[in-house]
Amino acid sequence: MFQVKKPNIDELKETLKLLLMFREEFSDVYPEADIGKVAITIQEHFDNGFISNAYLDGVLVGSVGAMETEWWFSKEKFLAETWLYILPKYRTFKIVRGLLKKMK
C-alpha cells in the first residue's frame, strides 16, 4: 500500500536515516553531511515548516521538506523546497507526484 503523510515525532529518526542516504548516494558531488545539522533542519521543518514522507507497504521510501519564505523581490510568500529525496529503487512518477501534491 502506498501512503504519503506528515511523519509523527517518533518517525523523525527514520526520516533522518533516509536523508543521510542522500549523502551516501551523492558523495562524489556534495560535502559530508553533518548529522546534527540534518537533525536540526528536520526538527525545524517539523515544528515550523512542512515535511511529508512516502511509505510503500509501511517502509519509508521518500521525503520532501519545505519552508514558507518570501520572494526576494516581494513580500508575498511561497513554499520553498529544502529537500526531495526518494530511494533509487522507488523513483517513480507515482511516488514523486504523491510527495509534491502534498506541498500544495
Predicted regions and their residues:
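Conserved beta-strand in the GNAT
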Residues: 53, 59-68
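A short, internal acetyl-CoA/4′-phosphopantetheine-binding micro-motif in the GNAT/acyltransferase core
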Residues: 82-93
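Conserved acyl-CoA
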Residues: 98-104
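A conserved beta-turn-beta hairpin within the catalytic core of GNAT-like acetyltransferases
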Residues: 70-81
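Short, basic/aromatic recognition patches
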Residues: 37-41
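A short helix-loop-beta-strand connector motif used in the catalytic cores of GNAT acetyltransferases and
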Residues: 42-53
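Short amphipathic alpha-helix that is part of the acyltransferase structural core
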Residues: 1-34
